[in-house]
Each structure stands twice: as structure tokens, then as C-alpha cells.
Amino acid sequence: MENLISLVNKIQRACTALGDHGENSALPTLWDSLPAIAVVGGQSSGKSSVLESVVGKDFLPRGSGIVTRRPLVLQLHKIDEGSREYAEFLHLPRKRFTDFVAVRKEIQDETDRETGRTKQISSVPIHLSIYSPNVVNLTLIDLPGLTKVAVEGQPDSIVKDIEDMVRSYIEKPNCIILAISPANQDLATSDAIKISREVDPTGDRTIGVLTKIDLMDKGTDAVDILEGRAYRLKFPWIGVVNRSQQDINKNVDMIAARRREREYFNSTPEYKHLANRMGSEHLAKMLSKHLETVIKSKIPGIQSLINKTIAELEAELTRLGKPVAADAGGKLYAIMEICRSFDQIFKDHLDGVRPGGDKIYNVFDNQLPAALKRLQFDKQLSMENIRKLITEADGYQPHLIAPEQGYRRLIESSLITIRGPAESAVDAVHSLLKDLVHKAMSETLDLKQYPGLRVEVGAASVDSLERMRDESKRATLQLVDMECGYLTVDFFRKLPQDVDKGGNPTHSICDRYNDSYLRRIGTTILSYVNMVCATLRHSIPKSIVYCQVREAKRSLLDHFFTELGKMEIKRLSSLLNEDPAIMERRSALAKRLELYRSAQAEIDAVAWSK
């Protein structure tokens, strides 16, 4: 069982060393879940004397006003009889104190280091471990004494500040409250009882200690309180008799003081029947036993909390990404890895592993065909325009059989309108590829970590897509131009010819420009244009995929990688500049994760040894 108190001691020290003081923060706290005994009392309640009686040493700063200005985590370790007593501070890990006057001075000095030589308070605890054959295994947290007024040099808020600090400790469900009250004052005015009642109204977590019993007015006693009639708690009240100021001035040692305390309770008629559960020795043993019991009952819940929090911390650290490398090679490698991750996510969108690539197919299967169908050839193939172009094409010599030049001009003027849908298809795919770049950037966690790199990768990707768009537009429009530049002769050869039995055309020269003849030309040209549209409907997507989609998959960041290899370390560093808030958060998370893993290892070691 003693291993359990030692276990909590180790975890408490780790908490303080790694910055977990149980304060409200954006980080999970282990400190608040650890069972502890918090010592609470007013400034004149005898709180310090009780602690020194439990330890058996003079070691706490004394004086008027607020002497305890930081929480003191006092960890007592019982060692073998005959061993020399010593003390250690967490902030001085390799220094042993055998002179307890020096311990008192170090407590005062360490307090001043945190608060300055003022009368301010701080919630950052001091950890003091005392090793002695004359103590029980126990951990106590000495809190600043409650006060009702601020003294000179203290802010007006000091009364509330101390109450808030004390309350922040004792309101935790795993905290045992050691409420120190002087017997020579009305219990109804006890600062310790008042604040403990606020957070523990049933008294299940509160242990009452009554001091200054020997200083009560003659004819009065504390029997009603000690027997639980005046104020009932779950645990019996414990009375103690501390050294008087005269004893302290005369350096009366603790062994003699404990002996006189025992004699007082055994010889005083009012308390004789309670003597076996009175005194600082009984208090220390009772607290040690109770703390062991509480720790044992809380360990499973603490283990569960630790495991859950470790998983949460690891997940958040993964989201925040790794810290930046210091050397140029490490920075370059980090940038390349991030870019490769982004590039793979972009490819996954195109290949259907992630959503979005299907929209490109929609351009080819719906948008382009619909645009081709919407083309209007009324102007090019109107009777007036057909007559005009055929007449102009004939020049001064009318055509003999078929107006070939007129056909060519009419077909070319019609096919040229296909450039619009072709360009629109290229632009639509370009827009979709840019959207996929932005999606891939938002899904690449490491790019969120480095805003500068995110901007550069985004700009480089868009630049590449624009070059690919321009090349795709050139190649795609070239397909249209090729259709305009060379007609499919077989289409016209397969058309039926109107000739008489003698092999002569049925139309005379004079009726070649009538409406029926012109209408037939228009119908023929429209059929040819529709055939070309059907061909381009399949060849335009091929050109776009080859020039844009395939090329984006193959070389989206090639130009950026070329430039990256030329960059100096200063430029590389600028790309990996992080938001300072993220850097601070990662550092804090790493320290907190170290704490939880350390606690996990300590608990596992104790469980293994049992």
C-alpha cells in the first residue's frame, strides 16, 4: 500500500516539472485527478504548527500576515530507523538538505523567485520531500491561509484570490480536505469550515482538526465538537495541542512536544476518554491510512483517464504535424514529403479514390455534347447566305456541276463556331482541376501547419494548370482547325447525284439558284457539320485529358521542385514558418504527453510489482 502513496508522489512531481498545476487551461490536467490532502485554515488557526507536528520538524516560514504564498506539496517518506533525516526540493533535484533551518529559508527564497519580494501569491506549487524514520508515508498540500482583509503591500483582491486558489484545490472530488479550526474561536466563524462546507456540504471529504484546545477559556471545553455534536463530519474530529510561541522561542523539540501533547489528553478529565484518537501522531497515521484507501479506490479511474488522454494527445499532435527540422537538408526533405503527400491526394481525387474527379467526366459526357447541340447555324445556312457565298465563290465563271468553293466556305464558316464549345470545355476542366488543387491543399494536414508553403504550393499548382490549359486550348482548337482545313471527301462522294439517263445533271444553269437547290445545299452542309461535331465530341476530350488531366497527374509540381532545389536555407525556412500559436501548442502537448506516459509507466510498474 505504501507503494501507492509513493506512486502519487512521483506523478505529482512529474506534473509540476512538466507544467501541470491543475489550473484552468486548454490542456488536459492529470494533477486534478490525483488524490491529495489539502490543508485549509485561517491565518491564525495553527495550520503551520499542525504540519510541523506531523513532520516532527521546524521547517515552515513564520511571521505575521500571509506567510504561505504558494502551495507547498509536502511529501513524507518513512525510511529505516537510524537513517539520517534529509529533505529535497523538486527544483533542486541534486541537493540534500539536512539542516531544516535551511529548508525554511529555501521555501521563502523559492516563493520570492516566483512572486518577487512582494506579498503576492502564486498557484505554482513548491515540492518538498522529507525522508525520516519518524514520519508516516503521507502527502499534504499546504495552501495559503485564508484571510478576511488585505494588509499593506497586498492588492485589494488578495482575499478573493486566496479563496479562489483554495477552492480550486478542494472542489476536486478526489481531494481530501483537512480543515484546521482553532478551539478558542467560535466554530461558526471558522474560515476552514465555511469554505469546506461550500464544496463538501455532506462532509464526506472533510477531516476536521481542532487546534489550541489548551488555550480555551477556563470552564469551557471542546468535547461537543470532538464528539461530532456541534458539527458532524463523516470522520471523527481530531484535537491537537501545538507548541506555544514560548516553546518555539525556546526551541522545544518535537519529540518533547508530542510527549506533552499525549500527557495533556491523557490527564485532562474532559478529553481522557478521547485520548486514543487525539494528537498529531494519531492524525498523521489516520491521514496516511485514509489516503492509501482513497488512492487504491481511484487508481482504476486514473488509469482509464490516462489511457484516454494519451490517445487524444497523440491524435492532436498528429494533426498539428511534426516540428520543423533545423538544417537545410531536413527542411528540403520535409517540404518534398509534404508536397508528395499533397500531390498524391490530388491524384486520388482524379482517380476516384477521393471524390471530385467524376465532374471532369461530366464535362465530356454532358456539358460538351449539350454545347455542340446548342450551336445555331441559321445565319450561316440561311438562303440568303448560301446564295451569297456560292455566287461570290463562283466569281465571273459559274460552277459547272457542284459549287465546291461555295461548299467549302459555308462549311468553314459553320465549323468555326465549334471553337466556342471546345474552349469552354478546356476552361471547365481547368476550373475543376483548380478546385481539386484547393481540395487537396485543405486535406493535406501538413500544409495547414505551414501557411507560407501552402501559398507557394497553391501558386505553383495554379501556374502549372494555366500552362497546361493554354497548351490544351491550342491543341483542342487545332482539332477544330484541322476539320476546317481538310474536308472528308468520302462524305460527299456517297451523296446521291441527280443526273438523267444520259449522265447529264438534271438542273439547268438557270435553276441552280432556286430555293430548292439552295435548301439541298444547306441540308448537305448541316449533315456534314453534324458529322464533324460527332467526331469532335470524342476527340476534344482526348486532347483535354492528354494535355491537362494526364499532365497534371504527371508534372503538377515539377517546376516548383526545380525552383526548390535552388533555394537557400533562409528561403526554405520562410516556407516552413509556422503560426507561433501552433508551435506553442505542439510544445505544450508534447510536454503533457510526456507527463501522461510517465504516469502510465509508474502505475504499470506498481501494478506489476504487486
Swiss-Prot record:
GTP binds at residues 44-49, 212-217, 242-245. It is found in: Cytoplasm, Cytoskeleton, Phragmoplast. PROSITE patterns: G_DYNAMIN_1, G_DYNAMIN_2, GED. Residues 31-300 form the Dynamin-type G domain. Residues 211-214 are annotated as: G4 motif. Its main location: cytoplasm. Residues 41-48 are annotated as: G1 motif. Residues 241-244 are annotated as: G5 motif. One of its GO terms (biological process) is cell division. It comes from the Eukaryota. The keyword Flavoprotein does not apply. Keywords: Cell cycle, Cell division, Cytoplasm, Cytoskeleton, GTP-binding, Hydrolase, Microtubule, Motor protein, Nucleotide-binding. Expressed in seedling root tips and root elongation zones, young root nodules and young leaves. Residues 142-145 are annotated as: G3 motif. Residues 518-610 form the GED domain. InterPro entries: Dynamin, Dynamin_GTPase, Dynamin_GTPase_CS, Dynamin_N, Dynamin_stalk, G_DYNAMIN_dom, GED, GED_dom. Residues 67-69 are annotated as: G2 motif. GO terms for molecular function: GTP binding; GTPase activity; microtubule binding. One of its GO terms (cellular component) is plasma membrane. Microtubule-associated force-producing protein that is targeted to the forming cell plate during cytokinesis. May be involved in attaching Golgi-derived vesicles to microtubules which direct vesicles to the forming cell plate during cytokinesis. Possesses intrinsic GTPase activity in vitro. May homooligomerize and heterooligomerize. May interact with CALS1 and UGT1. The term phragmoplastin refers to the location of the protein to the phragmoplast across the whole width of the newly formed cell plate, unlike phragmoplast microtubules which are concentrated on the periphery of the forming plate. Belongs to the TRAFAC class dynamin-like GTPase superfamily. Dynamin/Fzo/YdjA family. This is Dynamin-related protein 12A. It comes from Glycine max (Soybean).
